[in-house]
Amino acid sequence: MQVFPNGDFSVRTSLVETFQSTMSECFIRTVRDMLGSAVTSEVRRLLERNGIPPRDIASRFDEVVEILTHSFGSSARVLVYKTVASLYEEYSLRPSFGFYDSLKDRVALLREKVISDLLKPRHSPSIDDSIYIATR
């Protein structure tokens, strides 16, 4: 675990919460862009029937992948790949991984990079910019 100046773990918590929110948004946006709003609504219902509310999509992404794979077969990998690539782009990083690379590892690496480098997603009005000034 990274220790921030003055032991400020609230910065880490804020970054992790924002990361998870951003990942969930990337997932929903990817499904909507690729499959349309009607299918997106069905995917949300499918996840909720399996005990995964929208707020838990990122924290339970492994389960989301299993559910999608069960429902869509191997084509679910396209949704997962596009979601992870979109997440990297949201943090202004080039997705330098292939379709068959371990996407779970790529998400974990990005999460750690976000925390260690205090990265902010492009479309997040929820992060107070003062954390970037105070902790660098």
Task: Give the label of every model feature segment.
Residues 1-136:
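Long, compositionally biased intrinsically disordered regulatory segments in eukaryotic proteins
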